[in-house]
């Protein structure tokens, strides 16, 4: 039994084990599993009915969870989990969701709950709920404008004044004698090494003790101070008015000299310090031209008559290969009295023998005289008779060392280096005009003295035509013009009719031919052929040459190639030289034409050319002297070249290389060709080429009576020779002459490039002569009275001085009668002067001979000063001793306030002066003056004023006018010390954009298309008409002009002078930095710029670029402006701020320009490999992109499209740079300001561009809308939407608050403005914009041009009491109209030339009041409602407060109306109230109708500055550009 009992549970044990395993889940603790296993035997014992046998059986060994080593245990555990645990969990979930949860819900919903409350409680709960929702919407959703990231106004950059290391007036880096000397001879311009050594070889020094005097009248040389201080005195009295050479000047009308009582005192002219010259510009000219003859007629005729037999007067003698030989080989014998006169350039009084002596000294020159005599004694006697320093005495203040270059050195330099001499003379003549003539004419009113020089010059330049062509031939010429005059209209005739020139068509071909032949000849051997060039058989001349024979000209060919008049055809002489035969081939074809049609015209041209060349000093004797100079040029070490292959290299930088600053030759070898052909010893003179050129260029022109040939202030177009008729030379009486110093003349537009020099006159004369284009403007322009000075008769020349020396005309030239003139363009004269130095030397000699004594003394006192970039000229608080006139460069006046704060007072460009007021009042300097870039100045000492005032009392009147004008400017624009940034913005940019002469275009980083940008800007500047034209320069242009050594150390002097001449010639020069960062051209662009445009791509990274880092490293103080190029006409909000944030050096503003460009950056100089493949791929890509848009049926037009060309972005930038910006000022007036929208639409329809927008109150709102997109359509829509919001009475009522500060919270007003502008910033606007506010915390007006638009527009519209002030950086801002409701004055400071000012403010009630000394409020109310009362109603309390607030605004409004250039407009909107925004359409129509009517009235009066008129004139000039109306 026991065994059976023991064996019964054994088969159940595995089941128990499986049960144990199934109950022992992995997550059950082991303790629970153990207790369960211990209770299992007891349970099994109860079930089986047996007593417990646990004590008899051992515990089961397999009751623990299966281990990983037991595979069967794992399988059992998994089966238990799947088939038992998971179903149990699912069962529980289903039971809870279907039974338990519904039961709970049923129980909950079956319960009853009752709440009891009154209506007040319910209403409070609802109000609380609504308030919560309203608060959330109001303060969390609708006022996002208050949670914008803070963007304060951009502070104006602090001015960088780099420390000045120089003391006072000391020169930079002067440490020794040589530096002092080099500083003094800078007046000569660029000197190459041989010229410099030759000039200084015989220099002497002299020591003066303190108090010692030196009679400069006895000194014959160039004097300069090396060390010490010298005072220059002038003798105060002298009988008569003498010229430089001691001769009494004719026509001088200075009665003051005879009115003296005979005092022989001395007046202090100036003080000369270290490194300055004691000689004047005129005295230097006289040293170079001591032996030049003034008039060629007597000398040439006598010499020619002595040379030629009397029957041969009809056959002029050509110029020989050897100056000492005649046609038959016999030596020339010149009379004694003509020996000195025939020597034109060298200092010797006799012609050199055929083989020049191999020496350089002048002392042995007399031994080579053919007669064995020397004229040195005569020269000494002549020098004693005349002095280059008349009446001048120098006194040393301290022990002084002076250096003297004797006159012999200048004579030797003239003989050895004629072209270098001509270059020096050209430089001095240019500085003479800029310094002495301009100062005397403009500042001192010495118009008669300056203009008298040109009047007296006519006695040297008048040559009559031969008699045989003044009779029937001239009548036939007139008949041709009369026929053409009848055919053409009056307007065409006024511009001039030119006779057809048959040679003009071959002009360019012959020029290239000349260059080739010159190169050929330079490589040819130089044979000795004394007279083989000239053919003994000369054609017969059928006309008399009693006056001037054409054969007297500088030519190796027969000039009169026409036979007798009865001959049917003309023939050309046969020249033995193959080279000259080749030269003559172009003209041979033209000569075989009908004699009666072509030859007569050509004869006129030949004769006119004869007279012109005699007038300018090109005569046989001068040619002989030139040939001597050429022979002696053999001695020049620079000219010796033993390798013909290296000749080109030798002469590419020769000492005679005259820098032609005005003629941009496309041939880089032109200069060297000229040098070789002119200065080669022996050989054929290239005069034949020049002769051919001049015949090609000369024109015969007819002008009717009243036509203007030259306008006052313009550069001379060329030389006019009067054939028949009279020219009247005069000046405008009301002309102040300020423009003659070089300042800009806004009303005078000239073309930019002289592609057709012969048409220069027509391009300027049409503005006066043509009356059909703009009759109103022309009649108004002719209103100023004109004063006639003198007349030019037949045989006279006009424009000799101006055209030869490239001066501007001080007079205008009008045809007194119908006049026939020969015209030689200025470019031809410049070519002539370049090849033949005698022309400039003759001009210089004549100028020095005609100089009045007064101008000579002024020239002595004026000092030419050159300062470096950043150099301080004088400091604030220094003693004022001189006035400074800017000749070239740019200056800036800076006022240093409290705490070292720098404020820009003004900038002074070319032609402007600074310092008059303090010099005249003997006060200290009010500001520091420093040079922005390398600058040339004319220093006008105060001692000169004192001397002139005592001796010439008439000058004091002119000086008094000058001081009065400066005082008036100071009163109107006081230089007050502004300590706050809000108002200094207008002062810092006071005159910074006026008179900009150079603009540098610099990319921010590589890949910016600056070349394309520069070309488009150049085109825009040309279209708007820059005074004197505009040109652009890049590295290729510079290398083409000056060669590959332009940027070397030696070439920098050439480059600087070339750039200075360009800036003097053109009104504006663009420097395009199209090279690498560290290239010399990039450095030149930065150092030469008055204003630097930093160009960047708006969508690219705003990080600082490599070009900017290079710019900052150069430490330039020029004005810097940022230009952002956009592919589309849109600027995302905040983009501009990112660019300006890291660029504190941008001190001139920024511009948004739309320009299509490639988004992929390209290097400045891409490699040329696979260029064709790359271009082909790019073209294909561009075609595909274009076809994507052009193939669509519907083309989406942009929001804005410029309807007129001058409304483009480049034209806007061009007007800003030229100072011709158009400003729009919108005044405040509440709802009446809706009329602004209508007026702006009228301006748009009239085609008037707007460049700057400023506004006050509602004007700030409308102006901001217009400046944002520069279009009327979005402005109209947004303005109407805003007016609808403001017209809602409910919005106003919901915004009411307790009136502790204001009646409304301002939220609805803020929301209306913010919904219009969004988060845009003022910097992102397409047009420049500003608005003004009243800072009641600091009691001043502020102008805002940066920051969030909505804030400052809201501040400008904040009426006191209605809206709370806007808080800005701790200050409270209110409506700007309280101080200035029409900000015309501030707009003027931003550079606007024409300002449209629209005033919509309320009109003050000026009704006289008479209610007595006391006033009852009750009576006032009754009187207001009494219709029968005749007493006007007294103002209410609110009206009195309003009038009090606008007191200063009314005063500023009256001033604004009188500001020059302001066009005041006031639409008839007085019947509308300040808050009547509901009448939007009606007020808009009133403004639109008024604007159209006003602009039409201005247009009919000719007062509208419409760019269309200028464009019309430019189109007219462009149609004239190819040629005048020709026969």
From Swiss-Prot:
<dbReference type="InterPro" id="IPR050301">
    <property type="entry name" value="NTE"/>
</dbReference>
<dbReference type="GO" id="GO:0005783">
    <property type="term" value="C:endoplasmic reticulum"/>
</dbReference>
<dbReference type="InterPro" id="IPR001423">
    <property type="entry name" value="LysoPLipase_patatin_CS"/>
</dbReference>
<feature type="topological domain" description="Lumenal">
    <location>
        <begin position="95"/>
        <end position="116"/>
    </location>
</feature>
<keyword id="KW-1133">Transmembrane helix</keyword>
<feature type="short sequence motif" description="GXSXG">
    <location>
        <begin position="1255"/>
        <end position="1259"/>
    </location>
</feature>
<feature type="transmembrane region" description="Helical">
    <location>
        <begin position="117"/>
        <end position="137"/>
    </location>
</feature>
<feature type="compositionally biased region" description="Low complexity">
    <location>
        <begin position="299"/>
        <end position="310"/>
    </location>
</feature>
<feature type="short sequence motif" description="GXGXXG">
    <location>
        <begin position="1228"/>
        <end position="1233"/>
    </location>
</feature>
<feature type="compositionally biased region" description="Polar residues">
    <location>
        <begin position="364"/>
        <end position="377"/>
    </location>
</feature>
<dbReference type="GO" id="GO:0046470">
    <property type="term" value="P:phosphatidylcholine metabolic process"/>
</dbReference>
<dbReference type="Pfam" id="PF24179">
    <property type="entry name" value="NTE_Ploop"/>
</dbReference>
<keyword id="KW-0812">Transmembrane</keyword>
<feature type="binding site">
    <location>
        <begin position="846"/>
        <end position="966"/>
    </location>
    <ligand>
        <name>a nucleoside 3',5'-cyclic phosphate 2</name>
    </ligand>
</feature>
<dbReference type="GO" id="GO:0016042">
    <property type="term" value="P:lipid catabolic process"/>
</dbReference>
<keyword id="KW-0442">Lipid degradation</keyword>
<feature type="short sequence motif" description="DGA/G">
    <location>
        <begin position="1375"/>
        <end position="1377"/>
    </location>
</feature>
<feature type="active site" description="Proton acceptor">
    <location>
        <position position="1375"/>
    </location>
</feature>
<feature type="transmembrane region" description="Helical">
    <location>
        <begin position="74"/>
        <end position="94"/>
    </location>
</feature>
<feature type="binding site">
    <location>
        <begin position="682"/>
        <end position="809"/>
    </location>
    <ligand>
        <name>a nucleoside 3',5'-cyclic phosphate 1</name>
    </ligand>
</feature>
<dbReference type="InterPro" id="IPR002641">
    <property type="entry name" value="PNPLA_dom"/>
</dbReference>
<protein>
    <recommendedName>
        <fullName>Lysophospholipase nte1</fullName>
        <ecNumber>3.1.1.5</ecNumber>
    </recommendedName>
</protein>
<dbReference type="InterPro" id="IPR014710">
    <property type="entry name" value="RmlC-like_jellyroll"/>
</dbReference>
<dbReference type="InterPro" id="IPR016035">
    <property type="entry name" value="Acyl_Trfase/lysoPLipase"/>
</dbReference>
<feature type="domain" description="PNPLA">
    <location>
        <begin position="1224"/>
        <end position="1388"/>
    </location>
</feature>
<keyword id="KW-0256">Endoplasmic reticulum</keyword>
<dbReference type="InterPro" id="IPR000595">
    <property type="entry name" value="cNMP-bd_dom"/>
</dbReference>
<dbReference type="GO" id="GO:0005789">
    <property type="term" value="C:endoplasmic reticulum membrane"/>
</dbReference>
<dbReference type="InterPro" id="IPR018490">
    <property type="entry name" value="cNMP-bd_dom_sf"/>
</dbReference>
<dbReference type="Pfam" id="PF01734">
    <property type="entry name" value="Patatin"/>
</dbReference>
<dbReference type="GO" id="GO:0004622">
    <property type="term" value="F:lysophospholipase activity"/>
</dbReference>
<feature type="region of interest" description="Disordered">
    <location>
        <begin position="1504"/>
        <end position="1527"/>
    </location>
</feature>
<feature type="active site" description="Nucleophile">
    <location>
        <position position="1257"/>
    </location>
</feature>
<comment type="function">
    <text>Intracellular phospholipase B that catalyzes the double deacylation of phosphatidylcholine (PC) to glycerophosphocholine (GroPCho). Plays an important role in membrane lipid homeostasis. Responsible for the rapid PC turnover in response to inositol, elevated temperatures, or when choline is present in the growth medium.</text>
</comment>
<dbReference type="InterPro" id="IPR056556">
    <property type="entry name" value="NTE1_P-loop_dom"/>
</dbReference>
<feature type="topological domain" description="Cytoplasmic">
    <location>
        <begin position="1"/>
        <end position="73"/>
    </location>
</feature>
<feature type="region of interest" description="Disordered">
    <location>
        <begin position="299"/>
        <end position="387"/>
    </location>
</feature>
<feature type="region of interest" description="Disordered">
    <location>
        <begin position="567"/>
        <end position="596"/>
    </location>
</feature>
<keyword id="KW-0378">Hydrolase</keyword>
<feature type="topological domain" description="Cytoplasmic">
    <location>
        <begin position="138"/>
        <end position="1527"/>
    </location>
</feature>
<dbReference type="Pfam" id="PF00027">
    <property type="entry name" value="cNMP_binding"/>
</dbReference>
<feature type="region of interest" description="Disordered">
    <location>
        <begin position="765"/>
        <end position="785"/>
    </location>
</feature>
């Amino acid at each position: 039994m026991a065994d059976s009992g023991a064996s019964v549970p054994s088969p159940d044990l595995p089941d128990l084990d499986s049960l144990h395993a199934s109950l022992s889940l992995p997550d059950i603790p082991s303790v629970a599993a153990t207790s369960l296993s211990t209770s299992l035997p007891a349970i099994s014992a109860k079930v089986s009915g047996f007593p417990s046998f646990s004590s008899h059986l051992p515990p089961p060994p397999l009751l623990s969870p299966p281990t990983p080593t037991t595979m069967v245990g794992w399988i059992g555990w998994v089966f238990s989990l799947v088939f038992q645990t998971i179903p149990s969990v699912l069962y529980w979930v289903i039971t809870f969701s279907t039974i338990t949860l519904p039961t709970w819900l049923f129980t909950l919903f079956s319960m009853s709950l009752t709440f009891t409350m009154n209506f007040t409680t319910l209403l409070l709960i609802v109000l609380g709920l609504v308030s919560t929702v309203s608060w959330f919407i109001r303060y969390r959703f609708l006022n996002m404008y208050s949670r914008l990231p803070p963007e304060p106004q951009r502070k104006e950059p602090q001015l960088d004044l780099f420390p000045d290391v120089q003391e006072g007036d000391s020169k930079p880096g002067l440490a020794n004698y040589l530096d002092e000397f080099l500083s003094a001879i800078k007046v000569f311009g660029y000197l190459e090494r041989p010229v410099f050594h030759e000039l200084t070889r015989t220099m002497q020094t002299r020591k003066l003790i303190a108090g010692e005097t030196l009679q400069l009248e006895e000194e014959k040389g160039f004097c300069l101070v090396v060390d010490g201080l010298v005072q220059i005195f002038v003798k105060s009295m002298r009988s008569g008015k003498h010229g430089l050479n001691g001769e009494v000047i004719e026509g001088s009308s200075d009665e003051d000299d005879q009115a003296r009582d005979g005092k022989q005192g001395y007046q202090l002219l100036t003080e000369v310090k270290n490194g300055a010259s004691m000689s004047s510009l005129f005295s230097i000219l006289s040293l170079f031209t001591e032996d030049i003859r003034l008039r060629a007629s007597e000398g040439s005729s006598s010499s020619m008559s002595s040379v030629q037999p009397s029957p041969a007067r009809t056959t002029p003698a050509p110029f020989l290969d050897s100056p000492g030989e005649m046609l038959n080989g016999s030596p020339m014998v010149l009379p004694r009295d003509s020996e000195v006169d025939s020597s034109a350039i060298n200092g010797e009084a006799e012609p050199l023998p055929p083989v020049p002596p191999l020496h350089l000294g002048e002392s042995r020159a007399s031994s080579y005289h053919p007669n064995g005599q020397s004229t040195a004694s005569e020269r000494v006697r002549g020098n004693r008779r005349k002095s280059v320093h008349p009446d001048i005495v120098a006194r040393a203040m301290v022990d002084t060392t002076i250096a003297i270059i004797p006159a012999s050195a200048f004579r030797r330099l003239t003989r050895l280096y004629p072209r270098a001499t001509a270059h020096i003379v050209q430089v001095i003549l240019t500085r003479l005009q800029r310094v002495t003539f301009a100062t005397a004419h403009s500042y001192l009113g010495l118009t008669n003295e300056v203009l008298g020089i040109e009047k007296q010059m006519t006695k040297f330049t008048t040559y009559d035509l031969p008699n045989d062509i003044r009779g029937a031939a001239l009548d036939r010429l007139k008949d041709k013009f009369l026929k053409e005059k009848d055919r053409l209209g009056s307007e065409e005739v006024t511009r001039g009719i030119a006779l057809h020139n048959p040679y003009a068509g071959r002009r360019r071909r012959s020029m290239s031919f000349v260059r080739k032949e010159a190169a050929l000849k330079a490589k040819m051997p130089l044979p000795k052929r004394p007279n083989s060039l000239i053919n003994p058989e000369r054609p017969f001349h059928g006309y008399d040459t009693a006056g001037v024979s054409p054969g007297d000209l500088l030519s190796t060919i027969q000039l009169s190639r026409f036979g007798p008049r009865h001959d049917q055809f003309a023939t050309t002489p046969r020249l033995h030289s193959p080279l000259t035969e080749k030269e003559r081939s172009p003209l041979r074809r033209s000569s075989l034409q009908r004699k009666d049609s072509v030859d007569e015209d050509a004869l006129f041209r030949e004769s006119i050319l004869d007279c012109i060349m005699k007038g300018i000093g090109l005569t046989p004797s001068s040619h002989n002297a030139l040939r001597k100079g050429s022979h002696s040029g053999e001695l020049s070490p620079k000219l010796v070249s033993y390798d013909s292959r290296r000749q080109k290299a030798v002469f590419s930088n020769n000492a005679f290389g005259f820098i032609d600053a005005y003629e941009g030759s496309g041939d880089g070898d032109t200069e060297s060709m000229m040098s070789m052909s002119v200065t080669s010893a022996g050989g054929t003179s290239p005069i034949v080429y020049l002769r051919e050129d001049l015949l090609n260029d000369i024109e015969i022109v007819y002008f009717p009576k009243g036509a203007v040939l030259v306008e006052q202030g313009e550069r001379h177009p060329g030389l006019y020779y009067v054939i028949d008729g009279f020219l009247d030379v005069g000046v405008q009486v009301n002309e102040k002459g300020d423009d003659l110093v070089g300042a800009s003349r806004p009303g005078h537009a000239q073309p930019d490039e002289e592609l057709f020099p012969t048409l220069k006159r027509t391009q300027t004369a049409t503005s006066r002569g043509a009356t059909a284009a703009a009759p109103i403007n022309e009649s108004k322009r002719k209103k100023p009275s004109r004063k006639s000075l003198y007349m030019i008769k037949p045989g006279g020349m006009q424009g000799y001085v101006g055209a030869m020396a490239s001066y501007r005309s001080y007079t205008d030239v009008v045809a007194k009668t119908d006049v026939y003139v020969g015209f030689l363009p200025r470019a031809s004269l410049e070519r002539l002067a370049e090849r033949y130095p005698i022309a400039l030397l003759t001009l210089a000699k004549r100028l020095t001979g005609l100089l009045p004594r007064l101008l000579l003394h002024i020239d002595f006192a004026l000092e030419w000063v050159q300062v470096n970039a950043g150099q301080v000229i004088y400091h604030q608080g220094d003693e004022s001793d001189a006035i400074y006139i800017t000749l070239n460069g740019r200056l800036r006046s800076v006022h240093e306030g409290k705490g070292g704060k720098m404020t820009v007072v003004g900038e002074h460009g070319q032609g402007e002066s600074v310092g008059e007021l303090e010099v005249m009042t003997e006060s200290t300097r009010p500001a520091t003056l420093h040079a922005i870039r390398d600058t040339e100045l004319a220093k006008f000492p105060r001692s000169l004023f004192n001397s002139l005032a005592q001796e010439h009392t008439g000058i004091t009147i002119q000086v008094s006018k000058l001081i009065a004008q400066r005082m008036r400017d100071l009163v109107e624009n006081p230089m007050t010390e502004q300590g706050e940034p809000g108002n200094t913005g207008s002062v810092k940019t006071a005159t910074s954009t006026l008179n900009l002469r150079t603009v540098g275009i610099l990319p921010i980083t590589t890949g910016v298309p600056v070349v394309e940008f520069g070309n488009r800007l150049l085109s825009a500047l040309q279209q708007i008409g820059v005074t004197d034209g505009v040109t652009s320069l890049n590295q290729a242009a510079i290398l083409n002009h000056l060669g590959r050594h332009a940027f070397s150390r030696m070439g920098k002097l050439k480059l600087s002078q070339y750039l200075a001449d360009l800036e003097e010639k053109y009104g504006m020069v663009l420097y395009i930095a199209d090279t690498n960062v560290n290239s010399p051209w990039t450095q030149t662009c930065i150092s030469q710029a008055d204003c630097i445009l930093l160009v960047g791509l708006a969508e690219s990274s705003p990080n600082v670029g490599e070009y900017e880092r290079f710019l900052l490293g150069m430490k330039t103080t020029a004005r810097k402006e940022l230009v952002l190029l956009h592919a589309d006409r849109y600027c995302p909000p905040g983009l501009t701020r990112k660019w300006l944030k890291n660029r504190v050096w941008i001190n001139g503003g920024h511009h948004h320009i739309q320009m299509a460009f490639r988004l992929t950056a390209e290097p400045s100089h891409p490699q040329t490999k696979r260029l064709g493949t790359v271009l082909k791929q790019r073209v294909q890509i561009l075609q595909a992109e274009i076809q994507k848009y052009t193939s669509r049926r519907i083309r989406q037009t942009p929001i804005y499209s410029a309807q007129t060309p001058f409304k483009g972005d480049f034209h806007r930038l061009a007007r800003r740079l030229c100072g011709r910006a158009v400003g729009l000022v919108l005044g405040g007036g509440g709802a009446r300001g809706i009329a602004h929208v209508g007026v702006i639409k009228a301006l748009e329809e009239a085609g008037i561009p707007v460049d700057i927008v400023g506004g006050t109150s509602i004007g700030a709102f409308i102006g901001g809308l217009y400046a944002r997109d520069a279009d009327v359509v979005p402005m109209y829509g947004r303005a109407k939407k805003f007016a609808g919001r403001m017209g809602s009475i409910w919005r106003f009522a919901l915004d009411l608050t307790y009136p502790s500060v204001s009646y409304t919270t301002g939220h609805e007003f803020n929301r209306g403005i913010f919904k219009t502008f969004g988060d845009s910033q003022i910097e992102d606007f397409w047009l420049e914009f500003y608005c003004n506010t009243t800072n009641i915390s600091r009691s001043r007006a502020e102008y805002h041009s940066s920051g969030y638009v909505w804030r400052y527009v809201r501040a400008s519209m904040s009426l006191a009491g209605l809206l709370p002030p806007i808080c800005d950086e701790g200050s409270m801002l209110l409506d700007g109209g309280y101080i200035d409701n029409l900000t015309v004055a501030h707009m003027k400071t931003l550079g606007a030339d024409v300002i449209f000012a629209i005033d919509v403010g309320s009109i003050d009630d000026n009704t006289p009041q008479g209610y007595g000394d006391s006033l009852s409020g009750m009576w006032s109310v009754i009187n207001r409602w009494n219709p029968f009362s005749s007493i006007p109603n007294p103002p209410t309390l609110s009206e009195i407060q309003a009038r009090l607030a606008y007191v200063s605004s009314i005063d500023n409004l009256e001033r604004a109306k009188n500001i020059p250039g302001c066009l005041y407009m006031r639409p008839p909107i007085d019947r509308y109230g300040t808050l009547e925004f509901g009448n939007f359409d009606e007020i808009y129509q009133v403004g639109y109708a008024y604007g159209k009517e006003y602009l039409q009235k201005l247009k009919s009066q000719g007062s509208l500055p419409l760019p269309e008129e200028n464009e019309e004139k430019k189109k007219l000039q462009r149609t004239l550009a190819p040629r005048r109306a020709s026969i």
